[in-house]
Amino acid sequence: MKSHTEYLVFQTRKRREMVHITDQVEEIVRRSGVKDGLCFVSPMHITAAVYVNDLESGLIEDIEKWLEELAPARPEYKHHRTGEDNGDAHLKSLLLHHETTLPVTGGKLDLGTWQRVFYAEFDGQRRKRVIVKVLGVE
């Protein structure tokens, strides 16, 4: 079994941002040399998420609205007693799911027609890393 690890680095311009990363993950899979296996993608931060969905601007807006309705930015989170102001970012990360595992077939991500990989940042404007680990056979 082969293992290959790389890191993606992001510094979003906004506090909350959805970044399409399918091409970057696909390139890491290609460089890995793995022909059949799994690709694990996970932010190394607890206020971000990686998810799979459609690359359609209306849907992305709907997801952002839904997350804000379920975990609105507000001052009364108990987490804020620590001096932080990002309680909503922690909850949004949980709602969207923290990481994803993707199938690799024939040396490529084996995604459905409309499936795309996204990095979701909820407490941005600083340097963040995402680990991409590819496991499988050559």
Whereabouts are the PLM-identified features?
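Active-site histidine-anchored catalytic micro-motif
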Residues: 1-138
